[in-house]
Amino acid sequence: MVELDADLDHIVPSVLPPFWAKLVVGFVSLLCFARSYDGDFVFDDSEAIVNNKDLQSDTPLGDLWHHDFWGSKLSSNTSHKSYRPLTVLTFRINYYLSGGFHPVGFHVVNILLHGSISILMLDVFSVLFGGLQYTGKGQRVHLAPRASLLATLLFAVHPVHTECVAGVVGRADLLCALFFLLSFLGYCQAFKETGNKEGTHSSTFWVLLSIFLGAVAMLCKEQGITVLGLNAVFDILVIGKLDILAAVRKVLHKDKSQENAGMFKNGGLLFRIALLTIGGTSMLYIRWKIMGTGPPAFTEVDNPASFADSMLVRAINYNYYYSLNAWLLLCPWWLCFDWSMGCIPLIKSVGDWRVIALAALWLCLIGLIFQALCSEDSCKRRILTLGLGFLVIPFLPASNLFFRVGFVVAERVLYLPSAGYCVLLTFGFGALSRHTKKKKPVAAIILGILLINALRCVIRSGEWRSEEQLFRSALSVCPLNAKVHYNIGKNLADQGNQTAAIKYYREAVRLNPKYVHAMNNLGNILKERNELQEAEELLSLAVQIQPDFAAAWMNLGIVQNSLKRFEEAEQSYRTAIKHRRKYPDCYYNLGRLYADLNRHVDALNAWRNATVLKPEHSLAWNNMIILLDNTGNLAQAEAVGREALQLIPNDHSLMFSLANVLGKSQKYKESEALFLKAIKANPNVASYHGNLAVLYHRWGHLDSAKKHYEISLQLDPVAVGTKENYSLLRRKLEQTQKKDV
């Protein structure tokens, strides 16, 4: 749009050639988020990446097409139904190239993706602001360079993108956006004017390619399918130049003139729309079939408004959520990793002052829609229509209009809609510049927004580098969010700071009295601190609120076992296994219960079940070896130990246990080798040196025995057994010396 570019002449004074403009955009976009390159895996990264077996070579590649984003089977009732196999495939490639779970490689890919998307945005915005125009050679002319550069810079430095770029799971949104834009630009290629029959075939090819790229975008994230809707809007309103207001007037006045009807007969519009419709319907059908058991089941804490009884309350709150999303685009200062669990209290009546936000949102939207429909300036109509299209259409899957979503507000879903916001903001700056004589204040405002947003990106990227910083940054934004307190507590507990963790877990339970995961974790800490009575109360309440909470049932069983209430403990363990059949840790704890009751066969069976379900379950293997050793079944203990070491060859505790068995079987040489390997792996364990000393003592290697007794006593000076054995050895050495004399 020449007029808009002229309006921005004093704000973006020099016209950069497309190559240099893309270079500037790429550099700025990378610079803003570069700080996150060496961050940890945080928040959802743990489940989607670190704990996702689909990333590892043990899982066949074909399984990716049957699993959700988190690695669960889509057919499972507990699946979130997030079907993003291409995104998971990129994680798997990252894992392979990085040689494991090294986050730097994952983060660098995300940063580069954002840079690539920002560069592509320059071409997209050129179409939105300047329209489509091709040279005689079929190359698209880069129109409205000033407006497209400004809008792209606003997009590149928008802080709301931090979650997508700095959080590795945000790659789903980045890949979706990449193929979304490629699909849109591909659709634009369908309108080259070649003037021959081959041009029709070329047009069909580009439309089909656009649909294919839309399908790829959807396989990265579900939001990708909305590009087909945007392409249809672009075709009808921009290419077809449909004047909606004029069409409505004709319908109201029963005007039968063919002025607007001609557009449906020229340029193959109906054919292209038919292709888009067939493609979109097919994609939706296949997606629904893949989903299997129906839509995912969300809880009230995930999306409280969707569980409200009154349709009016639901509508008010949904619209309030839209206004919050709009505010995050307009003023991205209050950013939070999670907006659920009381972060945004429900609006229950029209008397709530927050209803003003709804009114403000719709006042702005209606004003923009009116301008988009009624303006006599076709360029203005195009910019506003496509700006609103980019803002609204990609947001529709997150709007709760078609199905319930599992969140209240999510910054990641604003990645694509923010492009529409940048279009509208740039258009607004152009209008402001046109109607004011002093251009420098407008330029200063734009420069200020770019610098402040860039600085905010850098700060926010730093907060996403570690879970501790990320969770603590949310306290000032959402102090009523129980999940924020829960995550801070969990992080502190992982660091070993149980006292501080208890404080945050208690606050999480206070804010949400039905927060069973906080109750479970708090109960666990209290159990470890031997505060068994309160631990039992919390865990009992957790399973009462959520009867199928297997982890809470298991932990309740551990507490009951500690309280010597063995029958209740066994029942709790059995209930946990009923709700989670493949639960190796529960079988392990059940085995410990049976061992306490001297039900040795049952204990061995339980531990064997644990190792079948989880072959690397070292504790279960160890307990089997020790129990068989203590009951005199040395041959069986040796067989189990060898089997365990074949599966977990570098486990020093298994080496130690098997070495003890071999020593008792007088296989001294092999026992010595295992003891030495265990000590090499973990040299600071007193019992390793002490038991090796006992082996040497029995074997008659008294000097070696003396050496390892002394090392063991240095590590643990109060070990009674070691002190007694060392005294016996010293007496024996003294007697030997006397005989020699």
Curated annotation (Swiss-Prot):
UniProt GO BP: endoplasmic reticulum unfolded protein response; outer hair cell apoptotic process; positive regulation of endoplasmic reticulum calcium ion concentration; protein O-linked mannosylation; sensory perception of sound
InterPro entries registered for this protein in UniProt: O-mannosyl-transferase_TMTC, TMTC_DUF1736, TPR-like_helical_dom_sf, TPR_rpt
Annotated Gene Ontology cellular component terms: endoplasmic reticulum; membrane
Disruption phenotype: TMTC4 conditional knockout in cochlear hair cells results in postnatal progressive hearing loss. Mutant mice have normal hearing at day P13 and are completely deaf by day P26.
Positions on the Cytoplasmic side per record topology: 1-10, 132-146, 186-198, 246-265, 376-382, 434-441
Keyword tags: Endoplasmic reticulum, Glycoprotein, Membrane, Repeat, TPR repeat, Transferase, Transmembrane, Transmembrane helix
SMART domains referenced in this protein's UniProt entry, alphabetically: TPR (SM00028)
Extracellular compartment segments: 32-110, 220-224, 287-354, 404-412, 463-741
Protein's membrane topology: Multi-pass membrane protein
PROSITE patterns referenced in this protein's UniProt entry, alphabetically: TPR, TPR_REGION
Recorded catalytic activity of this chain's protein: a di-trans,poly-cis-dolichyl beta-D-mannosyl phosphate + L-seryl-[protein] = 3-O-(alpha-D-mannosyl)-L-seryl-[protein] + a di-trans,poly-cis-dolichyl phosphate + H(+); a di-trans,poly-cis-dolichyl beta-D-mannosyl phosphate + L-threonyl-[protein] = 3-O-(alpha-D-mannosyl)-L-threonyl-[protein] + a di-trans,poly-cis-dolichyl phosphate + H(+)
Stretches forming TPR repeats: 482-515, 516-549, 550-583, 584-617, 618-651, 652-685, 686-719
Membrane-spanning parts: 11-31, 111-131, 147-166, 167-185, 199-219, 225-245, 266-286, 355-375, 383-403, 413-433, 442-462
UniProt key word Repeat: yes
UniProt family annotation: Belongs to the TMTC family.
Name under which the protein is recorded: Protein O-mannosyl-transferase TMTC4
Gene of this entry: Tmtc4
